[in-house]
Each structure stands twice: as structure tokens, then as C-alpha cells.
Amino acid sequence: MRRISSSQRRRLFFTFSAIVLSLGLVGTTVVALNYDSLRAQYLKLTTLDFEGPGEGEVVVRIESGDDGLLVTQKLLDAGVIRDFDSFYRLLIDSNAVFYPGSFMMKLRMSNKAAYEVLSSASNAMTYKVTIPEGFRAVQIFEELSKITGIPSAEFRSVAEDLSGFGIPDEAKTIEGYLFPATYSFDTQATAKDILGAMVSRMKQELERQGVEQKNWHSTLTLASIVQREAKLEPDFYKVSRVFANRIEIGMKLETDPTITYSYSGKDMSEVSRAEQIKHGYNTYIIEGLPPGPIASPGALALEATLNPVDGDWLFFVTINLESGETKFSRTLAEHESHVVFLRQWERENPNWYDD
């Protein structure tokens, strides 16, 4: 049997030692890897917060008056946040302010991400509706229905209860009391909520312009006529002056928009004179103001009605329906000379009334 030399024994020793050391290092690495993996799993199971912006979608409804405890519970129940206490502490530390509304959120959101959504009113889900100046109630109901999906008949039905909106007793309908503007309504808003907001906005405008409540109805009535007649901003104040002058001398207003008006939307120009007299809105027939507004006046029409420019005009006619150019006159003869320009424009634009 061959004997191993001392030099060979030394080489074997070092080789064996290296193998043992390598195995030890591998074992240590495996243990370390297992520890890191287990630790990550443990933290994932025990952490008090989700990571990131979340996933999926869920709507959370915040009501007016909800406090931090209730808001936190709603988020927890909806699966938005993971832990009640940690989110509630965030609210306390942030001096949180909440805004009522419906918020589109995600499932499994981090506390910070969830808080950022709720802390801004602009994140609430809303309907944006623009009601132009001069729209009549029937048009407003249709526009609101188109945007919100609430049937126009429901708006009309809700509008019948005038006492619920604090409208003056002399008003027979809600016509004229719905302020024309751009609104953002909560997606959960009812027909009554929406109309109530519009009436409140009109009241605010009347108060801002210094109109006493006893004069609300008459002011809105005249302003609605000014709104339907005037085309260009400077002319609002002149049209207002024409009507003020006519009222002062007991002259009929004789304004075309009152001929067609009815709350239901029916064109009253197509009914008999007897029906028009009974209806009471045709200012070519009645004396003074009609029973109520014929449309929703905006801020400009209200201001012009309250502050007509100085002048002694009794007549006006828009001679260019496209540009809105309007002529004002003191006498009937002067007025009729201006009407000639309108007739000429109509001949040059024969399809205008069909568009």
C-alpha cells in the first residue's frame, strides 16, 4: 500500500477544510434567505397599512356630520384600509377635515393614499350642470334630467311644493326662482336637493343686490323679461329703462316673450285671445307686469332691472338677430323706422328662424 506523503496530507487537509467552510457558508446563506423570507411574510401579515395606491374600485359615501371615527369605520368596512387605529391616528395628527359626498376609492389603499382622496372636496363624485340665463323651468327640468338621469317629471313634481323652498306666497310656480349658473351636484343628490340649491342661490343673489324680500317676486318678474329681451350687456340697462318708463306712465309692456310663455311649455301664442286673457301673461293684452317670471334671470338682468340707465326711450327693436344690435327710440315713428332694418335683415337671412 502506497503511503501518502506529508505534502499530500497537507493538501488534503486544506481541501477538506475548504469544503467544510464552503458548506458552512452555504448553510448560513440558506438560513439567512429563509429568515428574510419569513420576516417579509410576517411583516406582510402583521403590518398596519397596505402599500401603494390600491386596486379595484369602491364608492365610499361621506355624510355631512360624519366624524373621524365613523369615516374610519366606513373605510375599514369597505376594504379600503387595513387597520382602524393607524388610520384614525393619521386623521388626528393631520387635523383632518372631511367633505360630504361620494368618493371613488380603491381597495387595499395605503392610509396616506386614502386620506389624500378624502381630504379634497374636488375628489367627490359630482354631476356638473350648466343652466344658461333665460332658461325657462321646463327647459331647466329637461337639462337637469339629461345630466343626472332623474326624470324631468320628478323635478316638476318636487317643484309643485313651493312652501318647501321658502318662495314668496305670490309665486304660483317655481319659475324664475332657479338661478342660472354652473353647478356641481353630488351624485346622490335628489331632485329636491338640486332645486333647493338653485333656489337658495337665487335668494343669495337677490340679497347680494339688496332686494328686500317683499320685492323679490316683482323684481324677478321684470328681470326675467329683461333677460329674454336684451342681447348685449350695455343694452340690458337700456331695456330695463324702457320698461321702467312704460310702467311709470301706465303704458303696456308689449314684450314678445310674454306672448308665448306658459309654465308647462305650451306655446300660448297659438291659443285664443280669451285663453290668453285668462292666462294673464300676454303683455300686449294685460296692464303692467304678468303674474310672475317667464324665465330665470341671471345676475346681469337683475342688476340692470334694479339700476336702469338714464333715458326716455319707450321702444326698442333688435335689428340684427345674429349680432344682437338693438335700436332704442322715444317715439313710435322713430321705432317703426328702425323696424325697417329688422325686416331687411330678415329678408337677407330667410332661414334664420328655421335654425
Model-derived features with residue positions:
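Conserved SxxK-family serine transpeptidase/carboxypeptidase catalytic domain
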Residues: M251-A301
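Conserved catalytic or metal-liganding residues and their short signature motifs at active sites
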Residues: M1-E254, P297-L300, A304-D312, N320-D355
